[in-house]
């Protein structure tokens, strides 16, 4: 249906696209994110986010996690997850150990994150986490995979950081 009328096969061949307003194409503003900003100091037990297979619901755990020089260090069991405020308002970054994700040698980031649509990234090392964050910002949203300190794949979603122009 378009304009109250049922569409025919011929109608589907028509281009119904409309220009996207510029302000909807520039909505990812994370500012400078550094290793220092995503470090998580911990000594002893700390809060952990446990992923549950095939579920959107997570579980809160308190566990002893691996550390190096007083900071959390990812290993084969625990990855790091960061939530980065991406609307350019507060610059807040939340960091926690994530159990059950299992990424090795990389990071995955996205700007599609209901309810706030902030940038979420999970990975096993800071270089890839930072590269993935930068990749999402450079593409003004979407999904990014980083490995070896660089972006290796991207699905750009530049309309409000949530939708494709195509």
Annotate each PLM feature.
Residues 1-166:
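Active-site microenvironment of metallo-dependent hydrolases
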């Amino acid at each position: 249906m378009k304009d109250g009328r049922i569409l025919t096969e011929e109608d589907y061949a028509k281009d119904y696209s409309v220009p996207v307003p510029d302000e909807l194409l520039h909505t990812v503003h994370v500012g400078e994110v550094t290793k220092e900003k995503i470090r998580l100091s911990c000594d002893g037990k700390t809060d952990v986010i446990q992923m549950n297979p095939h579920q959107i619901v997570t579980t809160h755990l308190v566990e002893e996690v691996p550390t190096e020089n007083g900071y959390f260090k990812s290993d084969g069991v625990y990855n790091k997850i960061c939530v980065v405020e991406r609307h350019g308002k507060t610059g807040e970054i939340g960091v926690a150990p994530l159990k059950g994700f299992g990424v090795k040698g990389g990071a995955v980031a996205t700007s599609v994150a209901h309810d706030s649509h902030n940038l979420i990234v999970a990975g096993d090392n800071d270089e890839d986490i930072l590269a993935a964050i930068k990749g999402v910002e450079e593409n003004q949203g979407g999904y990014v995979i980083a490995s070896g300190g660089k972006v290796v794949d991207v699905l750009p979603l530049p309309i409000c950081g949530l939708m494709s122009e195509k």
